[in-house]
Structures are given as structure tokens and as C-alpha cells.
């Protein structure tokens, strides 16, 4: 096999490696029962959490009291038709008067607060914490050698820096390759659609299409396999474009060491004890995830719209600290403190990361919440990692004054 052919086959193999996982994440099976998550295995034959059974058998005739649940996330659509009646309202604030009526340091915080915005706008994308740490340590260690004389503390930092740089370069290379392959995939798909000559495509169109090269053959094969899952072409095309957006964000924002949007916030980032910054736009530029989470918790159970939330007494306090990228410890800590100080009894944190910039400031906020008898719920993640062996921040182990994690 010629060298150029081997290169082509290697690229094609990697192309399939990149593309197939994107679709495997979106595979569809039989439609689940409505509100399956609230159903019961014994009563309904569904592995739900037995919400409906609890209401009918344990809570029947009982009247609950409202509980404020803070959703620390990427934003919440407080006007969503299935949530708007379940949103926490700060009755001490007068809407839109530009005054901090309740003197808590946050102007017009009617439904919560956004710690990653300002009068300049909102942060949508940010780096991974890994990238921020590499950028922070670069001036000191980028040109250092293994033979360079360091103190014990510096040697530890240098070794950690080398480890992080290796991880960063590996992630960046994979993301760049993924983006390149998604560009090829998108261009090939556009070419195929143009040749077919119609927009409302069906399976038969791809069965009748004659690919002119190996890439087209693979694209057609993938699209046909997606049609076999009873998907419409519009949905398939959306998933392809989402794949492109995923890798584009990784390359241009998450892993771009020259990208730093913090100036939008305008805070003193080195001052972890700074509290009052941000704005009151709790929805932000992308509230899909936070709205989803809030809906699971508290979507109206009586309006026949969408799903029914787990609780009919939860009131959602929206706190925005999570961008498209890794959240920052200072913002997480302030989000926790804001929730506690403004009456939340439960804090939901559906986010996490593998590195921490300032673990101590988050630990102190967690301890503060515990002292006020507030329950914190933190996600384990979606990537099947053993979090006893691999870091996922914030975690249950507090750091001492030297930053070393101690116990649980």
C-alpha cells in the first residue's frame, strides 16, 4: 500500500472513530412512558424513583411547605411556561428599579444572581480549568528543565505543570483532529444534499445515491443507519451540526490558551473573597441545561405541559456560574454563599471538573452551607469515572492550609 493511501486510510479510520460516538450518544429506542422518571418499578414496571406512588400513598392529604432549591448552573429560563410559577421570588426587591432594596449587595436580584456577567454582558464560553492553570504556570515553568534547581514546593509544582501540559496537548490534538473531521463530514454532507437536489430528504434518497469516494460512502452509511432508528433527516442534520459545534467550542474556547473572557465580568479575579460582582440576568445566553435540571426538580405538576417535576413545593432560585467550559471556584463559592444567605435549603450543583484553581475558597463556602443546615447535592458526572480515584471538583474532601486534601 502506498504511503499516501496509508495516510488516507488512517484519516478515514479516525474519521469513523470521531463520528460514530457522536451518534451513539443520541441513539433512540422505543418511546419511554410519559414522566417515566416519576414512575415505580412495582406499580408501573418502570425504573423510576416512585414519585407518584409517594404522593398517593405517603403524602395523600398532607400539605407541604415551600422549599427554596438553588440551582447553581449555566442559567435558568425563569419565564418557561412549565417553570415560571415555580421560580423563587425575592420579595424584598422591587423589580427593575436599579436599587439594592434588601441591601444584600446585589441589585435587582429578583430570581437569583449571575456571577459570570456584568453590565458589559455575559460570559458564554470559557476555558477548561486545566488550561487556566497551564496559562497561570507558564511564565515560571515553560522554559524550565528537569535539571533546573527548585525548592521542594517548586519541584512539585513543576512536575504537576509538566503533567498538565502533556494532558493539555493530548486533549488539544484530539479536539483539533475531531474538528477537522467534522469539517470534512459537514462539507461532504452538503455536497451530497446538493447533488440529491432536495431539502426534505428521506431514507430512499440515500439508498439511491451513488457515492463517488470512500468518504461519501461512509457518510451515506452513517446517515442510513440513523434513518434506521426512525429519525427524520432534520434531526440527523442537527446532530451533525451539534458535533461540529462541540469540537469547535473545544478548539476555539475550552482549549484555547489565548482565550480568556474574564474581563467581561470585571471583578478582581485574584481576590477570592470578593462577593458583589455580576448581574441579575439569571438566564444568560444558554440556559438549556439549568432549565432542564430545574424542570426535573420543580416543573409544574398540574398544567399538563411537558413533564411533572419531583416536587410541587420546590421554588427554584437561579444562580448562574457555569459557562460553556469549566466553572471557576470563586464563582462557585459565591453562588453557594448567595444561596445560603437568601434562604435556600437545598443547593443543586450539576457540574464538575478535573482540576481546581482555589479549592479552599469552595471548601469554606461548603462549610458555611453546612453550618446553616443547607443540603448540597453535587453531580458525579457523565463519563463513568471512578471519582474515588480521579478528581472531580468540588468534592467531599476538604483541603488544609497547604491545599492538601484531608479525609472526608
Describe each PLM feature range.
Residues 1-29:
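Bacterial Sec-dependent N-terminal signal peptides
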Residues 3-4, 25-46, 374:
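Sec-dependent signal peptide cleavage junction
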Residues 28-41, 143-177, 183-186, 336-359, ...:
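Short acidic, glycine-rich surface-loop motifs adjacent to enzyme active sites
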Residues 56-60, 76, 88, 298-302, ...:
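Sec-exported extracytoplasmic/periplasmic mature domains
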Residues 56-69, 76-328, 406-407:
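Subtilisin-like serine protease catalytic core
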Residues 68, 315, 345, 373-375:
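Proline-centered loop/turn at the N-terminus of a beta-strand
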Residues 107, 318, 348, 376-378:
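Hydrophobic residues in well-ordered beta-strands that form the structural core
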Residues 328-329, 352-408:
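Substrate-binding/specificity loop regions of serine endopeptidase catalytic domains
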Amino acid at each position: 500500500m502506498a504511503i499516501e493511501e496509508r495516510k488516507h486510510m488512517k484519516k478515514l479510520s479516525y474519521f469513523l472513530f470521531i463520528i460514530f460516538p457522536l451518534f451513539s450518544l443520541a441513539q433512540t429506542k422505543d418511546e419511554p412512558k410519559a414522566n417515566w422518571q416519576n414512575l415505580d418499578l412495582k406499580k408501573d414496571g418502570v425504573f423510576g424513583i416512585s414519585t407518584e406512588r409517594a404522593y398517593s400513598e405517603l403524602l395523600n392529604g398532607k400539605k407541604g411547605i415551600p422549599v427554596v432549591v438553588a440551582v447553581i448552573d449555566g442559567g435558568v429560563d425563569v419565564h418557561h411556561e412549565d417553570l415560571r410559577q415555580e421560580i423563587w421570588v425575592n420579595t424584598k426587591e422591587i423589580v427593575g428599579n436599579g436599587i439594592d432594596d434588601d441591601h444584600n449587595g446585589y441589585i435587582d436580584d429578583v430570581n437569583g444572581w449571575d456571577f459570570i456577567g456584568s453590565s458589559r454582558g455575559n460570559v458564554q464560553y470559557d476555558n477548561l480549568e486545566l488550561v487556566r492553570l497551564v496559562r497561570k504556570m507558564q511564565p515560571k515553568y515553560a522554559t524550565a528543565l528537569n535539571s533546573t534547581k527548585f525548592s521542594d514546593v517548586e519541584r512539585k509544582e513543576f512536575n504537576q505543570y509538566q503533567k498538565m501540559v502533556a494532558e493539555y496537548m493530548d486533549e488539544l490534538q484530539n479536539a483539533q483532529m475531531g474538528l477537522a473531521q467534522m469539517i470534512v463530514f459537514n462539507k461532504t454532507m452538503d455536497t451530497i444534499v446538493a447533488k440529491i437536489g432536495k431539502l426534505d430528504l428521506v431514507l430512499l434518497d440515500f439508498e439511491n445515491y451513488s457515492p463517488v469516494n470512500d468518504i461519501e460512502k461512509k457518510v451515506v452509511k452513517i446517515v442510513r443507519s440513523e434513518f434506521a432508528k426512525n429519525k427524520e433527516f432534520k434531526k440527523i442534520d442537527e446532530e451533525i451540526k451539534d458535533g461540529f459545534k462541540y469540537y469547535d467550542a473545544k478548539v476555539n474556547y475550552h482549549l484555547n490558551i489565548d482565550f480568556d473572557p474574564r474581563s467581561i465580568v470585571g471583578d478582581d479575579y485574584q481576590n477570592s473573597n470578593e462577593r458583589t460582582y455580576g448581574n441579575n440576568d439569571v438566564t444568560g445566553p444558554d440556559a438549556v441545561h439549568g432549565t432542564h435540571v430545574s424542570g426535573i426538580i420543580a416543573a409544574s405538576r398540574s398544567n399538563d405541559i411537558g413533564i411533572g417535576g419531583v416536587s410541587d413545593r420546590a421554588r427554584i432560585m437561579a444562580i448562574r456560574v457555569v459557562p460553556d467550559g469549566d466553572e471557576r471556584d470563586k464563582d462557585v463559592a459565591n453562588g453557594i454563599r448567595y444561596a445560603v444567605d437568601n434562604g435556600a435549603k437545598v443547593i443543586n450543583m450539576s457540574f464538575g471538573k478535573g482540576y481546581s484553581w482555589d479549592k479552599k475558597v469552595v471548601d469554606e463556602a461548603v462549610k458555611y452551607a453546612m453550618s446553616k443546615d443547607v443540603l448540597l447535592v453535587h453531580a458525579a458526572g457523565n463519563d463513568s469515572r471512578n471519582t474515588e480515584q480521579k478528581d472531580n471538583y468540588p468534592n467531599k474532601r476538604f483541603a488544609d492550609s497547604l491545599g492538601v486534601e484531608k479525609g472526608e
